Swiss-Prot record:
This is Gamma-aminobutyric acid receptor subunit gamma-2. Glycans are attached at N52, N129, N247. The keyword Disulfide bond applies. Residues 40-275, 323-334, 465-467 are extracellular. It comes from Pongo abelii. Heteropentamer, formed by a combination of alpha (GABRA1-6), beta (GABRB1-3), gamma (GABRG1-3), delta (GABRD), epsilon (GABRE), rho (GABRR1-3), pi (GABRP) and theta (GABRQ) chains, each subunit exhibiting distinct physiological and pharmacological properties. Interacts with GABARAP. Interacts with KIF21B. Identified in a complex of 720 kDa composed of LHFPL4, NLGN2, GABRA1, GABRB2, GABRG2 and GABRB3. Interacts with LHFPL4. Interacts with SHISA7; interaction leads to the regulation of GABA(A) receptor trafficking, channel deactivation kinetics and pharmacology. Allosterically activated by benzodiazepines. Activated by pentobarbital. Inhibited by the antagonist bicuculline. Inhibited by zinc ions. Potentiated by histamine. Keywords: Cell membrane, Cell projection, Chloride, Chloride channel, Cytoplasmic vesicle, Disulfide bond, Glycoprotein, Ion channel, Ion transport, Lipoprotein, Membrane, Palmitate, Postsynaptic cell membrane, Signal, Synapse, Transmembrane, Transmembrane helix, Transport. GO terms for cellular component: chloride channel complex; cytoplasmic vesicle membrane; dendrite; GABA-A receptor complex; plasma membrane; postsynaptic specialization membrane. Gamma subunit of the heteropentameric ligand-gated chloride channel gated by gamma-aminobutyric acid (GABA), a major inhibitory neurotransmitter in the brain. GABA-gated chloride channels, also named GABA(A) receptors (GABAAR), consist of five subunits arranged around a central pore and contain GABA active binding site(s) located at the alpha and beta subunit interface(s). When activated by GABA, GABAARs selectively allow the flow of chloride anions across the cell membrane down their electrochemical gradient. It is a multi-pass membrane protein. Pfam families: Neur_chan_LBD, Neur_chan_memb.
Length: 467
């Protein structure tokens, strides 16, 4: 009887555990040497950490509940019908935030405004029961519910902002209240009354109403008594300064019905600095320059003529430039009046010299001066030291500074613009007339022109600035 092989049995019994342990060691060693294993694990750990961090920073919102709420609200909802149709008018509370105004284009009579426009109304179809009080939604939801058909009545062009996404916001409360806001840039019409230009003030309106719903369907109301404005220092008004604003509500009657019209009036006052430098000061200096002609010798024909023509042409250029910043209105503005009067003064200075030169150049020597030397004739002294009447009825002026006369009134020698000796000075038909010496026209002009221009400026500025 052979004895049992204990070692072989023991070897078969213990060989399996030992082999398994060895294989486990080798597998762990190979896995530790594999480079992607640890990195994959670290990435997974990082993703878990980021995911946990997101959940920590963001409040837990039951997204499934919001989706269910929206689906329930939109189920059977008809966005073509206004709230409470056939029951009562829909009340729209409006509000506005003025981000900026400007520039104002006087030629096209329009201005640019950037606003945030808000509308609030109640829609009972959008009520929901949930612990969520308000649904904060983006612009994708706007087209799925009813929105008021508000339009700006005096807008020439309006642009909504789309960068980086449409600048529109929608809020729905659980009681059915809806808030809809958007940002707009509008080129609105403003009828400028330029009678007092450039000392004018304007109230530029921004009007809006419903496009298709009359007062029986939609009623607009201001949410607040006044409109809020941003920092006016960043506004591009340039020639204007912002004075204030006011908002009103009115009803406009049309053939299609009565519409509630909401208006905001922006009060603007023009700044005169630009036009003072560009127009008023140059025109005044040109007028003063034309007076230099009165101190130049009357025999200096080229100098005085060149000065007069130059000032007239300069005034013509200034008047043309001043009109470029204005629309082609048919009435006279304050600047037109000032430029026109300045042109009249400059042109009158040129005409004054033309008149003076004409009469001075047409002087003639006394015809009887040589005759008196050759054939002395007896005379009767009627006016000592002023005039003598000769037998041949020729009248002469004998003054210390005049040896010439002017032909006037039946061939008699004339020494003044309005008066001729002797019939002129002593005649009853000339009684009370002003006696003006043509030779002294420059002296008269030196006083008359500055005085008249100063009086005009006094009346002009007082009338337009204080009356």
């Amino acid at each position: 009887m052979s004895s049992p092989n204990i070692w072989s049995t023991g070897s078969s019994v213990y060989s399996t555990p030992v082999f398994s342990q060895k294989m486990t060691v080798w597998i762990l060693l190979l896995l530790s040497l594999y480079p992607g294993f640890t990195s994959q694990k670290s990435d997974d750990d990082y993703e878990d950490y980021a995911s946990n961090k997101t959940w920590v920073l963001t409040p837990k919102v039951p997204e499934g509940d919001v989706t269910v709420i929206l689906n329930n609200l939109l189920e059977g909802y008809d966005n073509k019908l206004r709230p409470d149709i056939g029951v009562k008018p829909t009340l729209i509370h409006t509000d506005m935030y003025v981000n900026s105004i400007g520039p104002v284009n006087a030629i096209n009579m329009e201005y640019t405004i950037d606003i945030f426009f808000a509308q609030t109304w109640y829609d009972r179809r959008l009520k929901f029961n949930s612990t969520i009080k308000v649904l904060r939604l983006n612009s994708n939801m706007v087209g799925k519910i009813w929105i008021p058909d508000t339009f700006f009545r005096n807008s020439k062009k309006a642009d909504a902002h789309w960068i980086t996404t449409p600048n529109r916001m929608l809020r729905i409360w659980n009681d059915g209240r809806v808030l809809y806001t958007l940002r707009l840039t509008i080129d609105a019409e403003c009828q400028l009354q330029l009678h007092n230009f450039p000392m004018d003030e304007h109230s530029c309106p921004l009007e809006f109403s419903s496009y298709g719903y009359p007062r029986e369907e939609i009623v607009y109301q201001w949410k607040r008594s006044s409109v809020e404005v941003g920092d006016t220092r960043s506004w591009r008004l340039y020639q204007f300064s912002f004075v204030g604003l006011r908002n009103t509500t009115e009803v406009v009657k049309t053939t299609s019905g009565d519409y509630v019209v909401m208006s905001v009036y922006f009060d603007l006052s023009r700044r005169m600095g630009y036009f003072t430098i560009q127009t008023y000061i140059p025109c005044t200096l040109i007028v003063v320059l034309s007076w230099v002609s009165f101190w130049i010798n009357k025999d200096a024909v080229p100098a005085r003529t060149s000065l007069g023509i130059t000032t007239v042409l300069t005034m013509t250029t200034l008047s043309t430039i001043a009109r470029k910043s204005l629309p082609k209105v048919s009435y006279v503005t304050a600047m037109d009046l000032f430029v026109s009067v300045c042109f009249i003064f400059v042109f009158s200075a040129l005409v004054e010299y033309g008149t003076l030169h004409y009469f001075v150049s047409n002087r003639k020597p006394s015809k009887d001066k040589d005759k008196k030397k050759k054939n002395p004739a007896p005379t009767i002294d009627i006016r000592p030291r002023s005039a003598t009447i000769q037998m041949n009825n020729a009248t002469h002026l004998q003054e210390r500074d005049e040896e010439y006369g002017y032909e006037c009134l039946d061939g008699k020698d004339c020494a003044s613009f309005f008066c001729c000796f002797e019939d002129c000075r002593t005649g009853a038909w000339r009684h009370g007339r002003i006696h003006i010496r043509i030779a002294k026209m420059d002296s008269y002009a030196r006083i008359f022109f500055p005085t008249a221009f100063c009086l005009f400026n006094l009346v002009y500025w007082v009338s337009y600035l204080y009356l």
